Amino acid sequence: MRCPFCGHEDTQVKDSRPHEDGAAIRRRRICAACSQRFTTIERVQLRDLYVVKADDRRVPFERDKLARSVRIALRKRPVDEERIERIVNGLVRQLEASGETDIPSRDIGKLVMGTLREVDIVAYIRFASVHWDFRETKDFAAILQSIPGTADGDVPVVPGDAAAAIAAESGPGGVKRR
């Protein structure tokens, strides 16, 4: 591995330990040229995943982008960093276990929303407002009305006008229709 300080190719592993519930390996390394120490984290990647965007573009899946989105949704909420990492690891494992290499972005969003809904309802609403592109207060009102009626944690996929789509899936008082 290349040293991040001097760019030298020869580094030695001094210590390896399991990291994040065994889902990754944390390695302490030392550069043979400049003697600087640094840490790397290695994760198992079952397959290369690609995200299919709404405009049918296909881009490589980025775990860091998913983690950043989850962290933003959970910012200033009572969820510690360790739990956020477990959430992200679980989401990535679910995506890898799906058997698909091309995953529509709306499916990733639905998976994240389902998880956030169970963890923190405010984070769920924050994420949904970006994912569904809320533009008006009625969009927030519609999702707030849908929350008490959804007992099983199933999150509707809302294309286009969020309020209309949520209303279409919910009956009177926000109770989700089956």
From Swiss-Prot:
Enumerate the Pfam families for this protein: ATP-cone, Zn_ribbon_NrdR
Q: Return the Basic and acidic residues bias intervals.
A: 7-21
Residue ranges annotated as transmembrane are: none
Paste the cofactor note.
Binds 1 zinc ion.
* Positions of the UniProt region annotated as Disordered: 1-21
Q: Cite the ATP-cone domain residue spans from the record.
A: 49-139
Asked if the record carries the keyword ATP-binding, the reply is yes
Arranged from A to Z, the UniProt key words for this protein are: ATP-binding, DNA-binding, Metal-binding, Nucleotide-binding, Repressor, Transcription, Transcription regulation, Zinc, Zinc-finger
Zn finger region (unnamed)? 3-34
Q: Which GO terms describe its biological process?
A: negative regulation of DNA-templated transcription
UniProt keyword annotation of tRNA-binding present: no
Q: What does the record give under GO molecular function?
A: ATP binding; DNA binding; zinc ion binding
Q: Which cofactor does it need?
A: Zn(2+)
Protein's job: Negatively regulates transcription of bacterial ribonucleotide reductase nrd genes and operons by binding to NrdR-boxes.
Q: Which family does it belong to?
A: Belongs to the NrdR family.
> What is this protein identified as?
Transcriptional repressor NrdR
Recorded source organism is Gluconacetobacter diazotrophicus (strain ATCC 49037 / DSM 5601 / CCUG 37298 / CIP 103539 / LMG 7603 / PAl5)
